[in-house]
Amino acid sequence: MPQFLFVPGGKRSAQDFDSVRGLLRAQGRLSDAITLSDPEQNDLSQHIAEVCALVEEGDAKELHLCGHSYASFVITGAADRLRGRIARLVFIDTLIPESGRSLFDFFKQAGIDPTAFGVPAWPPFVEPLTFDEAAFAALPKTYLHCLRSQFLSLTAGIPADLQSRLASENWTYCALDADHYCMIDQPAAVVERITG
């Protein structure tokens, strides 16, 4: 039975996953969540190191690393450093990182001002992430797409993009009728998708 580690997005707290973790606990499943250090003071590399340190302290045999929003960059970077320790990555209403690009790069490509979404130019959001794309493609991955997300203008193209990559890059796609904070809005639906 897999264990789950939840990583919230920028300036958010591990408490965002309390309801999800409570439902998992009721099923006899183990989970943990981390609050990342202040994104105004620390960068993406530091956040990746924090997740790696927590994983390395534990002894999970089948760990599913789950990242919400900005944390997709964190879990991707952590999985790259922890090869063999992560069984699956779960992307919760987020962008899918590409090696050599930052979160801000995706906003720029879409012609969207990040500050309009309350995303300032803090260090983690402008630092490019570099990782082994072949190793990433080989790792099983789940994408939870929130259809009422405040960030739909950024994520609307993901279903079509993933359709061509489902089999070759080990993706599972799930749509949720939820807003961006689905783990708060619909925790039972999140649990169903990540344990099914």
Question: Language-model features: where?
Answer:
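Active-site catalytic motif of lipid deacylating hydrolases and related acyltransferases
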Residues: 2-59, 173, 179
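Glycine-rich His-Gly loop
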Residues: 7-10, 69, 94, 146
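Gly/Ala-rich beta-loop-alpha elbow adjacent to hydrolase catalytic centers
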Residues: 66-75
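Flexible "cap/lid" loop of the alpha/beta hydrolase fold
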Residues: 80, 84-114, 123-125, 152, ...
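Hydrophobic, aromatic-rich cap/lid helix
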Residues: 113-141, 145-150
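Conserved loop-alpha-helix segment in the C-terminal half of the alpha/beta-hydrolase fold
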Residues: 147-177, 184
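Post-His helix in hydrolase/transferase enzymes
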Residues: 184-195
